[in-house]
């Protein structure tokens, strides 16, 4: 009698054990690659959602309902995109916490590129939150964009420019959709720079042991 279940289990363990990573780093170093996976999922689902979305204040909410109810597998795309965004932030906060705990901020170029990534990511998430144009979307757009008015001299002009008028209206939603669509490409570019800078100097070494110790 051959226990194939145990054999497959052993093969799976072998695959993980063959991962070419030194024992001087831990599970907390997984979150960078997890973030890259999240980014790919968000771009893939976001593309299919953008095909069916309508950036108009009278039709935006209805188009979301249409995606969830009428588009084949639209509900999966919509839910994956929404929940994926939350997962993205969970991963990035753990990634940052690990960096703070183990002193990754000493690698200034990598840390500053990561900080820039976080700012772009938060902006992208905000623009995406507004897109369904429900009650909370409208409230968020009003409150957050009004913060620009706190900037001396330029505040009111900047807010009017961002809104596309003297109040939040259709032009606001259109430009928010355009920004939400274009910013992920900035995230991809910045992520590439972040990874290149990291591989240029290497990750920090919490145990202080040789990476080839295994």
Swiss-Prot record:
Positions bound to a ubiquinone: 199
Pfam families, alphabetized: Cytochrome_B (PF00033)
Cofactor note text: Binds 2 heme b groups non-covalently.
Binding, heme b b562: 81, 180
Main location group: mitochondrion
InterPro entries per record: Cyt_b/b6_N, Cytb/b6-like_sf, Cytochrome_b_N_euk/bac, Di-haem_cyt_TM
Places the protein is found: Mitochondrion inner membrane
Keywords per UniProt: Electron transport, Heme, Iron, Membrane, Metal-binding, Mitochondrion, Mitochondrion inner membrane, Respiratory chain, Transmembrane, Transmembrane helix, Transport, Ubiquinone
Organism domain of life: Eukaryota
PROSITE patterns, per database record: CYTB_NTER
Known cofactor(s): heme b
Membrane topology recorded in Swiss-Prot or TrEMBL: Multi-pass membrane protein
UniProt similarity note: Belongs to the cytochrome b family.
Subunit structure: The cytochrome bc1 complex contains 3 respiratory subunits (MT-CYB, CYC1 and UQCRFS1), 2 core proteins (UQCRC1 and UQCRC2) and probably 6 low-molecular weight proteins.
Protein name, as recorded: Cytochrome b
Annotated source species: Agkistrodon contortrix contortrix (Southern copperhead)
